[in-house]
Amino acid sequence: MALGKNKRISKGGKRGKRGKAQETMARKEWYDVVAPSNFEKRQFSKTICNKTQGTRIAADVLRGRVFEANLADLNQSAGEEEAYRKVRFTVQEVQGRNLLTQFHSMEMTTDKMASLLRKWCTTMETTVEVRTADGYTMRLFVVAFTKPQANQQSRNCYAKQRLVKWLRMRVTKMIKRRLSKVQIKEAVSLLTRNVLSDALVRRCNPIVPLREMRIRKVRVVRTPKFDAQALLNAHGTIPTSVEADPREVEEAVEAAPAAAKAAE
């Protein structure tokens, strides 16, 4: 019979004693995510991160995180009409408990894009890549839909190919002319407040009647070398971190004994 080690009767010593279990949330810290100053609501989100321990620095972990917010929540004066657009920000710098972000991308929701599609019309799409004055390269995706002309008898409203090419050329020229002269902060304001899209509609309607013309997606594909002073200028006055109000706990009132109730 071969002799083997019986795990049930062997008494091996422990290699090391386990330390006292520490609560998970005790090792973490909360940070406020701050949007640039061209948005009305600056602190739009909170995030959590492990505290700095040894060579693992919390600021290095937080840089590069991307956060998404609804445009109607960021610009509350615009109302619910802007709720179909999602804006993303990327963290570039950590200042105390505030995360200073910069514009990352913007796009329409899927249900809004699906509601614009119709039959018997031409869908025109174009992509424009433009470089801002401070070195950011943005890629814009524009979509447009035709509509019937006045007193038209035909059911469809298809556009001729030469008009589609003409419209794409005008959209490309206008976007490059408007955005190449401004910095990223002004470019985002032109996009989020519909200044650029309204100008495109006014200039392109004489070419072909348009039912809708939207900038459905914007992406920052290339960024310049990080400049801390430029980021601080984009944020302006940074709001202080607002902590949650402490919860008030009412004192419990002891119930009277049963004997005392009976005596009463």
From Swiss-Prot:
Start and end residues of each stretch annotated as Disordered: 1-24
Gene Ontology MF, one: structural constituent of ribosome
Pfam families: Ribosomal_S3Ae
Gene Ontology BP annotations: translation
UniProt entry tagged with the keyword NAD: no
GO CC term (a single one): cytosolic small ribosomal subunit
Entry keyword annotation includes Iron-sulfur: no
Record's subcellular location: Cytoplasm
Keywords: Cytoplasm, Ribonucleoprotein, Ribosomal protein
Residue ranges, compositional bias (Basic residues): 1-19
HAMAP family on file: Ribosomal_eS1_euk
The family this protein is said to belong to: Belongs to the eukaryotic ribosomal protein eS1 family.
Subunit text: Component of the small ribosomal subunit. Mature ribosomes consist of a small (40S) and a large (60S) subunit. The 40S subunit contains about 33 different proteins and 1 molecule of RNA (18S). The 60S subunit contains about 49 different proteins and 3 molecules of RNA (25S, 5.8S and 5S).
Name by which UniProt lists this protein: Small ribosomal subunit protein eS1
